[in-house]
Amino acid sequence: MADVPGYLRTCLDMGKIAFLAILVSTGIVLQILACALFNNWWPMLSVIMYVLLPMPLLFFGGSDSTSLFNESDNSWINAAKFLTGASAVGSVAIPSILKHAGLIGWGALALDLSSYVVFLVAILGYICIGDASDNYYSYI
């Protein structure tokens, strides 16, 4: 992209951020629909896990975002990876347990899990944008 004019490059970069914002808002809408369509607010429990998911990396990972993907001897980084993985499993386990207990139906389970998948795609998209060669998004 070195030969692309600056104004076009900025427009494309803002398009990527807008796409990520649309993904996140779609995930929020799916989460609310999982609750509102079936008049059952139990699926909102998985929102707690969505909020807790990035916390270990924020507290223990520091400013190095690549520490999640690299092998490390630092015990704090390893603890952050473990707690993040446990939160990710909990994000899928909570709706599954609620369905098994009979508190939510199949539709709410499908919407809740699809919300999780949309959030996951948004996070992976953010990581891919953050790994760009120009490090333009390092301030976000």
Swiss-Prot record:
Assigned keywords, A-Z: Endosome, Membrane, Protein transport, Transmembrane, Transmembrane helix, Transport
GO CC aspect terms: endosome membrane; plant-type vacuole
InterPro entries to which the protein is assigned, alphabetical: Vps55/LEPROT
Transmembrane annotation, as ranges: 17-37, 41-61, 76-98, 109-129
Lumenal side: 38-40, 99-108
Recorded superkingdom: Eukaryota
Subcellular location: Endosome membrane
Membrane topology: Multi-pass membrane protein
Any single GO BP term: protein transport
Stretches assigned to the Cytoplasmic side: 1-16, 62-75, 130-140
Function, in words: Involved in endosomal protein transport.
Family as reported in the entry's similarity comment: Belongs to the OB-RGRP/VPS55 family.
Protein name per the record: Vacuolar protein sorting-associated protein 55 homolog
